[in-house]
Amino acid sequence: MSRDSIYIAAQSGWPVLMMAGPGVGKSMWTYAFGDTMGMPVETLLLSTCDPSDVTGLPFINKDDQKSLAKPTWFRNLQEKRGLLFLDELSCAAPAVQAPALRVVNELAIEDEKMHPDTMVIAAANPADKAAGGWDLAPPLAN
């Protein structure tokens, strides 16, 4: 996928997955893209995350209902347009990939949404080049 294709896809609201070997500049390109667009970049280094880093920590609210305390990155992307960068997606455990899929597809956690102009870019290494990596769930890979 060319840089122009990534640019067009991201601007059109489609999530983008950059799949390439380590060290080719996927992360650097994403930060430069965010800078060019004048958008803050919120990064989740998924290889070091657990599910609560993606969805937030559970708690019991004032109505005795289970809820989630949303992570800072999510609250930041609710307030203003920004770019969510899911780095090292192929090194994320399946338990982290699952909540990441919902965030990518719905730009939401529970019933709260991110800013409607939020862009999502993910970076992954091919399975044969991802040290300690996992196969991507088909919905994420597509």
For the regions a language model picked out, list residue spans one by one.
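AAA+ P-loop NTPase catalytic core and its hallmark functional loops
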Residues: 1-142
